[in-house]
């Protein structure tokens, strides 16, 4: 009887959270371990309504092995017809007192990071998004070879309010 109740609560929770996420169009994650500076996290987007406007986010899950207060990323969106948009981004990961900005229980925190707003995917075909870490230690020219503490990298598309 107790396990049936636990299963019911689990299923109810999943339904509750999935029904509250009406803005979500795309939300995928890639698990990583010791993110190498040359490794790309890739996402392919297909069948996105070209008449709508969207907001884009990068989702990062980190644990206490992440030793930095910020995160530098290089992103690239490849459009179906060949156009490419590249960005170098910096995000704060902690408050000034060192407390994580992300939400979550235990060691793992999740940060939903604004990437772009009011984006139209007006070309038909597949879009490709790549995300690469670009972290360096203070004073170093070379990037950090293996970035510890990032457990998952995600890409999310939401319907825009505009």
UniProtKB/Swiss-Prot annotation:
The keyword Lipid metabolism does not apply. The keyword Membrane applies. GO terms for cellular component: plasma membrane. Residues 1-19 form the signal peptide. Pfam families: GldH_lipo (PF14109). It comes from the Bacteria. Disulfide bonds: none annotated. It is found in: Cell membrane. A lipid is attached at residue 20 (N-palmitoyl cysteine). Keywords: Cell membrane, Lipoprotein, Membrane, Palmitate, Signal. It is a lipid-anchor. A lipid is attached at residue 20 (S-diacylglycerol cysteine). NCBIfam families: GldH_lipo (TIGR03511). According to PubMed:17107561, motility has not been observed in Gramella forsetii although it possesses genes known to be required for gliding motility. This is Gliding motility lipoprotein GldH homolog. It comes from Christiangramia forsetii (strain DSM 17595 / CGMCC 1.15422 / KT0803). The gene is gldH.
